[in-house]
């Protein structure tokens, strides 16, 4: 049995938690290790028993962690674990953003690569980035990886000169789903724009337009459900703010759902929706995959890049241009055609191609 270290955004974010679920369930005979906070005791929905969550909460671990930080070697526990395992799978979406933590993130990955040797990157997009130096630094890093599979063509084009670079549609397109259910509510995934760099100035317009859309949907005879994908990124705060803007007499038509680690429950909530208004990236992907009409509100290029890859010709808005966020535009959108979804699911499987080969090798 091979043993693999998972590097993921372990913050009880539904999209990233689904990556972990899909990885563990696909490779039932592989033992996976994930460093996470104690909140991950609440993670539910992985149908296999092959994930060991390592918590940095014992006294000895805290001492080691502090020593590592003191000598400029943060995440030393991760390094030591990578050294004793068969490989590292870095699975996630926006995991290569140039920001104040870029240098430290790169050092950690470089050490993981040196210790873990067999390093796989699945489901990612590259950027946003500001400097060619950042891109060149990762060009050299990717060259040493066992496999790199991006989730959009834009990122692939940046590094396609490397033989080990591939791309497919988002991994979540290939998630095995329950039978489609026609629901009676419109599901909104809502974010707090001010929690993201560069969007605090549009927050008032964003909430006002969501309020108007909510009231118009209620007026049309449908109920509404506000859904949080990640408490840590202030989705719940955003929902409470929007609810406070809506007249109390309309609250009986509105419910809310806060994701706190139960993936199957969250997927059922999404599956029971009539349609989806998606600011969250994976609300958009899951809405598409569940054959729902989706109205995307793009907060980054990663969303518009994926829409372009899907040749999406329907209505959507962006945080940079909210003019199209209206009931008239929303009600025009339809579910994606079945042939596009089948192709997207097949493309999503591509991310696992090289990892399949590696984990199925004898020895």
Q: PLM features: residue spans?
A:
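Active-site anion-handling motifs in enzyme catalytic cores
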Residues: 1-363
